[in-house]
Curated annotation (Swiss-Prot):
It comes from Clostridium botulinum (strain 657 / Type Ba4). This is Small ribosomal subunit protein bS6. Binds together with bS18 to 16S ribosomal RNA. The keyword S-adenosyl-L-methionine does not apply. GO terms for cellular component: cytoplasm; ribonucleoprotein complex; ribosome. GO terms for biological process: translation. Belongs to the bacterial ribosomal protein bS6 family. It comes from the Bacteria. The lineage of its organism: Bacteria, Bacillati, Bacillota, Clostridia, Eubacteriales. Gene3D superfamilies: 3.30.70.60.
Length: 94
């Protein structure tokens, strides 16, 4: 099991409940695949450095988790097919 960190930005058109529902969805992907979520830091709505997909702000979330090496690929796939995700990044923690 390795430690990972992911940051993702969600569309600002979501309301607060939609934002939290998406975060719970990604947490459940990790937990259903046998991983554990160590920390979730909701940064809230922030301005982007530049426009992405014609939006200039988004909901930022930082999530730390522990999982096997296949889970980040599955989480990346889920991020890509979720329309509300503007940007995401998954890195391995040393």
């Amino acid at each position: 099991m390795r430690k990972y960190e992911t940051v993702f930005i969600l569309n600002p058109a979501l309301d607060e409940e939609g934002y939290k529902a998406n975060v719970e969805k990604f947490k459940s992907v990790i937990e259903n695949a046998g991983g554990t979520v160590d920390n979730v830091d909701l940064w809230g709505k922030r301005k982007l450095a530049y426009e992405v997909k014609k939006v200039s702000e988004g909901y930022y979330t930082l999530m730390n988790f522990t999982a096997d090496t296949e889970l980040p690929k599955e989480l990346d796939r889920v991020f890509r097919i979720t329309d509300t995700v503007i940007r995401h990044m998954i890195i391995t923690q040393e």
